């Protein structure tokens, strides 16, 4: 009998076991599509990024003009740039939905997979931040100045750390060149971590909407979920193309059309939309070090979620009180995102402080209490 190459070849076997013959729960919904969508986002960003890097010049006197040149004179340069800039937004939409799915259905109980996922999120945030600095517009420059300057709040070593990161006494040419180097490197780190993430996931197998073991009812990934994923790819790539072709600057900041000027500060310094929730939490605390700690905690709190699980059920499918809490948390994050885009004045200050307080209270206090309460109510 002829050998089946797909199942016996050392390399093809790995691909086969991850994408073709992978045993998958028969009842996973469209919410399980976002992992593969994130993979497509990463590939798209690496390809468009590579094409952009071929025409970009990492020098303060040339960076802004090299981006302008790319959009005017390079074949489809405008399209590649718009796909790359808006692809980042789509990447964050997908990762936030992916994390929300994991939170709702208790996927975080696969602790290794979850922890690698949080590290992936942090790496993605770092990549997006250094990438935003590269066009060297006003918001690029001032965003870099404000955010890197936060490290100076660290006691004793803060100032030294910031000057070391800058490569001088302010954000200047050395900062831009190292940010370009980091922005080129980090996506490949993300790709490596993704493989680790998948390795850990395939140790336990996927979770499912009921949060119960599904070993007795698994189906092959291909053709059932591969065809389902293709629908997701099509919808995502259509929305990316629509955004990039019809309103490429919708999510950008108009300040970034002005070349960086260290002598003129923009009236409202704010990051891209996907960082606004964390920025609002940072601003809600009047003390610099306190704000930095809250900013770090807003993402690092995800590491604690598996430890705070008190319910005897894995998923929230049959836990109405936790569901209410979950959607309040989602609303709270949307409020934080909106407040982060507003100027620092009344009433936004107090709204931001209340929303920040609620964010940490729900995750650290209310979820564990409600989980235990539901056990009581259901006599579990």
Swiss-Prot record:
Query: Which annotated residues bind heme b b562?
Result: 84, 183
Q: Report the record's Gene Ontology biological process terms.
A: mitochondrial electron transport, ubiquinol to cytochrome c
Cite the InterPro entries for this sequence.
Cyt_b/b6_C, Cyt_b/b6_C_sf, Cyt_b/b6_N, Cytb/b6-like_sf, Cytochrome_b, Cytochrome_b_C_euk/bac, Cytochrome_b_N_euk/bac, Di-haem_cyt_TM
**Which cofactors are reported in the record for this sequence?**
heme b
Please give the CDD domains that the UniProt record associates with this protein: cytochrome_b_C, Cytochrome_b_N
The record's comment on cofactor binding reads: Binds 2 heme b groups non-covalently.
Q: Which residues bind heme b b566?
A: 98, 197
Specify the protein's topology with respect to the membrane.
Multi-pass membrane protein
| Chain ranges passing through the membrane | 34-54, 78-99, 114-134, 179-199, 227-247, 289-309, 321-341, 348-368
Residues reported to bind a ubiquinone: 202
Query: From what superkingdom does this record's organism come?
Result: Eukaryota
Question: What are the record keywords, sorted?
Answer: Electron transport, Heme, Iron, Membrane, Metal-binding, Mitochondrion, Mitochondrion inner membrane, Respiratory chain, Transmembrane, Transmembrane helix, Transport, Ubiquinone
One GO cellular component term noted in the UniProt record for this chain: respiratory chain complex III
Kindly give the Pfam families that the UniProt entry links to this protein. Answer: Cytochrom_B_C, Cytochrome_B
Q: Which GO terms describe its molecular function?
A: metal ion binding; ubiquinol-cytochrome-c reductase activity
Cellular compartments annotated: Mitochondrion inner membrane
Query: Is Cytoplasm set as a keyword in this record?
Result: no
Q: Where is the signal peptide?
A: none
Function text = Component of the ubiquinol-cytochrome c reductase complex (complex III or cytochrome b-c1 complex) that is part of the mitochondrial respiratory chain. The b-c1 complex mediates electron transfer from ubiquinol to cytochrome c. Contributes to the generation of a proton gradient across the mitochondrial membrane that is then used for ATP synthesis.
Q: Which family does it belong to?
A: Belongs to the cytochrome b family.
Additional observations: Heme 1 (or BL or b562) is low-potential and absorbs at about 562 nm, and heme 2 (or BH or b566) is high-potential and absorbs at about 566 nm.
Subunit annotation: The cytochrome bc1 complex contains 11 subunits: 3 respiratory subunits (MT-CYB, CYC1 and UQCRFS1), 2 core proteins (UQCRC1 and UQCRC2) and 6 low-molecular weight proteins (UQCRH/QCR6, UQCRB/QCR7, UQCRQ/QCR8, UQCR10/QCR9, UQCR11/QCR10 and a cleavage product of UQCRFS1). This cytochrome bc1 complex then forms a dimer.
Protein name from the UniProt record: Cytochrome b
Source species, please? Paradisaea minor
UniProt gene name: MT-CYB
């Amino acid at each position: 009998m002829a050998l089946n190459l797909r199942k016996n070849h050392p390399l093809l076997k790995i691909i086969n076991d991850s994408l073709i013959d992978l045993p998958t729960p028969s009842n996973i919904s469209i919410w399980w599509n976002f992992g593969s969508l994130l993979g497509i986002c990463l590939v798209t960003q690496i390809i468009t990024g590579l094409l952009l890097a071929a025409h970009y010049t990492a020098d303060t006197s040339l960076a802004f003009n090299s981006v302008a040149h790319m959009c005017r004179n390079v074949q489809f340069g405008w399209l590649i740039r718009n796909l790359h800039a808006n692809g980042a937004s789509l990447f964050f939409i997908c990762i936030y939905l992916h994390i929300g799915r994991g939170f709702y259905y208790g996927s975080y109980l696969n602790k290794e997979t979850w922890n690698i996922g949080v590290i992936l999120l942090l790496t993605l945030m770092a990549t997006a931040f250094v990438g935003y600095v590269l066009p060297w517009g006003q918001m690029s420059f001032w965003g870099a100045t404000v955010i890197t300057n936060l490290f100076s709040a660290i006691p004793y070593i803060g100032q030294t750390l910031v000057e070391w990161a800058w490569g001088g006494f302010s954000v200047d040419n050395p900062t831009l060149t190292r940010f370009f180097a980091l922005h080129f490197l980090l996506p490949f780190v993300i790709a490596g971590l993704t493989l680790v993430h998948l390795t850990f996931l395939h140790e336990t197998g996927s979770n499912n909407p009921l949060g119960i073991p599904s070993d007795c009812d698994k189906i092959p990934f291909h053709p059932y979920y591969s065809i389902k994923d293709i629908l997701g790819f099509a919808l995502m790539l259509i929305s990316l193309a629509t955004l990039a072709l019809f309103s490429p600057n919708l999510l950008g900041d108009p300040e970034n059309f002005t070349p960086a000027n260290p002598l003129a500060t923009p009236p409202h310094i704010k990051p891209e939309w996907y960082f606004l929730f964390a920025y609002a939490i940072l601003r809600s605390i009047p003390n610099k070090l306190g704000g930095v700690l809250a900013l770090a905690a807003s993402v690092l709190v995800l590491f604690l979620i598996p430890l705070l699980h008190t319910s005897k059920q894995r998923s929230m499918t049959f836990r109405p009180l936790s569901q209410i809490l979950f959607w309040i948390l989602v609303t709270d994050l949307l409020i934080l995102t909106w407040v982060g885009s507003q100027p620092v004045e009344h009433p936004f200050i107090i709204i931001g402080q209340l929303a920040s307080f609620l964010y940490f209270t729900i995750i650290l206090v209310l979820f564990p209490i409600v989980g235990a309460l539901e056990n009581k109510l259901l006599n579990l």
